[in-house]
């Protein structure tokens, strides 16, 4: 017997149950990035949560989970993530989860991480269209030259200072990513919360200042711990966010910032560097390919009614 429970928030016991499911999925799929303790990953924060149980009473087991972000992306579209426990797949739970989410969602977007054929078949069955691709690109730091960055005249690089630079970074972010469904919503509060994460490293957060001392760009790097089922089981660096103020674009600042971060990650001993880029951002993809990056994964977002 299958039962669904919707919740606006998860109590401690439910968080533990969901974490166990996510960790099991990570062991099989390499995703999502979830820690054995602490808060759930950001993509599962906020309302609403859907828990799918198999069995009754004390014997009921959590076999599936969905997070429905009813707050929506920057364009008012609700976004869902669906995960079925690896030990309970191919039993109709994924279909049932999707049906339940669709009954409660409006203008829905659903992520499929890894562009799995089963997800494509399920999307076709429910009339969902392939609306967005997010490419995961990777490069070997040992095989690339990555020369010293050449900055535009009057621009200098320095690293982020916590408690001082938040407003300046968010101002650039807002202008650089006004088109982006997620990054455009990143604010000072979120940046301060990120600084409490174990992976945050101000020494890997590069800022570009112009001659007047105004921040006109940034490159925020990130280091992921080893994941046995992803990227060869080794720690990897990430070109997390590169943002350039539109007024400072066109002079090579974006490439210079990217190179500064890449060289920093290599100096930290990371043999592999990854990044995420929109599949339709041809200019950025071309730049990354020249820097030695190749596409290794594709995430797909399916859309309801478009």
UniProtKB/Swiss-Prot annotation:
Gene Ontology molecular-function annotations: mycothiol synthase activity; protein-N-terminal-alanine acetyltransferase activity
GO biological process, one term: mycothiol biosynthetic process
UniProt keyword terms in alphabetical order: Acyltransferase, Repeat, Transferase
Residues at which 1D-myo-inositol 2-(L-cysteinylamino)-2-deoxy-alpha-D-glucopyranoside binds: 182, 222, 238, 276
Pfam families hit by this protein: Acetyltransf_1
Alphabetical list of Gene3D superfamilies matching this protein: 3.40.630.30
Binding site for acetyl-CoA 1: 82-84, 90-95
Residues engaged in binding acetyl-CoA 2: 242-244, 249-255
Keyword Transferase: yes
Catalyzed reactions: 1D-myo-inositol 2-(L-cysteinylamino)-2-deoxy-alpha-D-glucopyranoside + acetyl-CoA = mycothiol + CoA + H(+)
Domain N-acetyltransferase: 5-162, 155-306
EC code: 2.3.1.189
Subunit structure: Monomer.
Similarity field: Belongs to the acetyltransferase family. MshD subfamily.
Function of the protein: Catalyzes the transfer of acetyl from acetyl-CoA to desacetylmycothiol (Cys-GlcN-Ins) to form mycothiol.
The name this protein goes by in its record: Mycothiol acetyltransferase
